[in-house]
């Protein structure tokens, strides 16, 4: 009983860190997939697709009608992550809502998405303006 209690007390903090790490990795995967899906959908439908990121609410959405996007269309990201976006303000539907637009020809408006953990480590996703490619780099 004592040994089990000791093992639990030593393992509990690690489980919390493991869970945080898992959430971070899943959030990065979701954003990369969303950007790639937006690029693919723009090409397939012949209509521009926007990857919208609400940095204050830590959520994102894919849409081809960014002016009419509804709050319920957004997917949540972990609140513990600090998300910042460099984007072309011309394609943003409203202040405080970042948008990276993917065009049917394969290009995009370009931009960078930084996802930072509470520890300060993170990743930068760069969306190329010419080809719409998504690149990932540790920061």
Task: List the model feature ranges, each with a label.
Residues 6, 10-36, 40, 44, ...:
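N-terminal helix-rich module
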Residues 1-2:
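N-terminal signal-anchor/signal peptide hydrophobic helix marking the start
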